[in-house]
């Protein structure tokens, strides 16, 4: 017996009339009123039915870590995992700081380090080295690393590009060029430590960072739509140009006997760290991170998308401008204390995002701890690899950050970033 043929009725339902040829149901026309709603409903059901592992993030058009389906970013694991990650980073940072206090051109036994820190030892060369030379350097490295890492995490959200950081966007190079100009106009490049104790060097660095950011934005907008990829490319170009200009200023205006010291600082170094150079970076870090933590939710909205953030009430243009100014201020103060240290703001946020997910309320503290740990370890290597000669710490971060940058590009290739 032959099966009954079914025909489609007006509403797309089969009539079940026997002997009639089977006619497939036609999909609704795209221009009918119900088509968009139906498509959105199907997309919503598909996104809701698709299981997603905690912390799993996708890459948007610009590579920004956002959840599939346009939902806000999810935390990687629960509170226990977050606590374990923070505790582990604190322990690792304490161990790295202890090793940095003990190791160097002069090796100090751990017991002597502990006695110097607790005040149980009297005046001695070991106590002077620990308290007056190495401890300020370790603390400054932790502060600068934390500041650059937090700024890097924020910039990656602002431009929605995983390759963004203060160095690659030209902010660090602009701050360095502004600081070098202050040094040259201030009467010589040998006053790095002294000038840092005033507001002149950070102010010059801040102006240089802002001007660099404006220049990068202007170049990225030239000849087309502003996208995150064009922004990063313009930032890399401006970074190299400003670094060359800063070096030229040092060569032309610097006295030969002071040129090496200034070049060491411009390449990124913590050799000028003293107790009086630590207060301003530490204060700016505390205020800056506290302010950015209050902006965690708007930063999360930017990861979802420009249109979605606007619909939810965020003035994205004004928000970006304000956060860019804050990020430039933090970067300028860090650069004025340590020189241009690259790639810490690129590597630490990615490691933190893998550990605790994309929400910025959890990401920023972990990125700060990761950046502090990275720079303390890099400075330890800089002081011990070729002891008693110090290697500029920026050289070591570039040696590790460059391959990481290439790996990141190879790991997640994608089209040009979304329009900003």
Regions found by a protein language model. Give the residues of each.
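Alpha-helical transmembrane segments in inner-membrane proteins
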Residues: 2-17, 21-34, 42-45, 50-420
């Amino acid at each position: 017996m032959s099966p009954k043929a079914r025909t489609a009725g007006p509403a797309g339902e089969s009539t079940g009339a026997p002997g009639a040829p089977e006619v497939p149901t036609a999909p609704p026309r795209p221009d009918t009123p119900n088509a968009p709603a139906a498509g959105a409903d199907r997309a919503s059901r598909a996104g809701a039915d698709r299981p997603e592992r905690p912390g799993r993030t996708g890459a948007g058009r610009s590579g920004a870590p956002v959840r599939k389906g346009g939902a806000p970013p999810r935390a990687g694991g629960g509170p226990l995992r977050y606590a374990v990650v923070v505790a582990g980073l604190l322990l690792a940072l304490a161990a790295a700081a202890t090793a940095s206090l003990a190791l160097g051109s002069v090796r100090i036994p751990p017991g002597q380090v502990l006695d110097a820190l607790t005040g149980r030892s009297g005046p001695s060369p070991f106590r002077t080295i620990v308290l007056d030379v190495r401890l300020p350097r370790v603390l400054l490295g932790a502060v600068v690393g934390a500041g650059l890492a937090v700024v890097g995490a924020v910039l990656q959200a602002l431009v929605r590009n995983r390759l963004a950081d203060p160095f690659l966007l030209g902010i660090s190079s602009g701050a360095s060029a502004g600081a070098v100009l202050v040094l040259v106009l201030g009467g010589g490049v040998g006053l790095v430590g002294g000038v840092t104790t005033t507001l002149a060097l950070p102010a010059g660095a801040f102006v240089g960072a802002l001007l660099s950011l404006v220049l990068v934005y202007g170049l990225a907008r030239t000849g087309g739509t502003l996208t995150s990829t064009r922004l990063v490319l313009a930032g890399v170009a401006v970074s190299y140009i400003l670094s060359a200009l800063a070096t030229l200023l040092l060569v032309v205006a610097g006295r030969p006997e002071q040129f090496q010291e200034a070049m060491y600082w411009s390449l990124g170094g913590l050799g000028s760290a003293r107790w009086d150079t630590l207060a301003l970076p530490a204060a700016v870090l505390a205020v800056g991170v506290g302010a950015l933590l209050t902006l965690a939710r708007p930063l999360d909205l930017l990861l979802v998308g420009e249109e979605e953030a606007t619909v939810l009430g965020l003035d994205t243009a004004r928000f970006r401008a304000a956060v860019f100014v804050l990020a430039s201020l933090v970067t300028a103060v860090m650069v004025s204390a340590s020189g241009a240290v690259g790639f810490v703001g690129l590597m630490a946020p990615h490691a933190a995002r893998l550990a605790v997910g994309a929400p910025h309320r959890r990401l920023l503290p972990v990125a700060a701890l990761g950046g502090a740990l990275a720079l303390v370890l890099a400075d330890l290597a800089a002081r011990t690899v070729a002891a008693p000669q110090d290697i500029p710490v920026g050289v070591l971060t570039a040696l590790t950050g460059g391959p990481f940058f290439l790996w990141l590009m190879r790991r997640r290739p994608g089209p040009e970033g979304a329009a900003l």
